[in-house]
């Protein structure tokens, strides 16, 4: 009798154990399958759709904005000096990054495609969103907070064979301005001076269309050079443009008083079309005087 009771108790315990372990294993298996299924779904279906959506949006924007050979979308970084070959131009583009030159049309994405977006601009923002042209006043340099999308060019390079003189005691500043000028005026001739005391002899032995002057230089300043040039009528046809960090209102008034035609603020983050327009305007005004 006791043996029968004991067997029944053992059987009931065994059944209880099975009933407890069985559903647990099934629930665990179901949860595991659910997790795996949804994690795979999240990774293989949701994320690729997001990437494709962004890619399609960018591709449609590119096709409408970047048209090879279209002069309305000319980039000065695609214009090279006649003496530079394709390999040199590629090296120059790397130098642009080292010198701080920024051009969204030459920014390459991780897929090797040319992008007209600045690395600092979200991909969701269309390029045309900030193409509104700011208003400028005489001797008022464009704000250093200018939207980098404005660097997109709408004009072709100027083929004129202008003669430019750059005077700056900092060789890096000279190289930056020199490269910008060659992009805008590929046929121009540029003379560079780090020693401002040599300017007097240079302007007597060479004819320049525009002299670009740093203001703060040792021994003789850009203001002194401009004042001396304007005191000699022979230099009335020569344009003078200051390239400086000193752009306060009282500084600009002094520059205008001594005969400086225009002022670009450092760093040179201007729209290339704007730079060309200002230089051309200075040259036209000086020729007519």
From Swiss-Prot:
GO biological process: filamentous growth of a population of unicellular organisms in response to biotic stimulus; phosphorelay signal transduction system; positive regulation of filamentous growth of a population of unicellular organisms in response to biotic stimulus
Protein keywords: Phosphoprotein
SMART domains linked to this entry: REC
Domain of life: Eukaryota
Coiled-coil boundaries: none
Record domain Response regulatory: where: 163-281
Keyword Phosphoprotein carried by entry: yes
The protein's role, per its UniProt record: Required for stress adaptation, morphogenesis and virulence.
Species this chain originates from: Scheffersomyces stipitis (strain ATCC 58785 / CBS 6054 / NBRC 10063 / NRRL Y-11545)
Name of the molecule in the record: Stress response regulator protein 1
Modified residues annotated as 4-aspartylphosphate in this record: 214
Biased segments, Polar residues type: 127-136
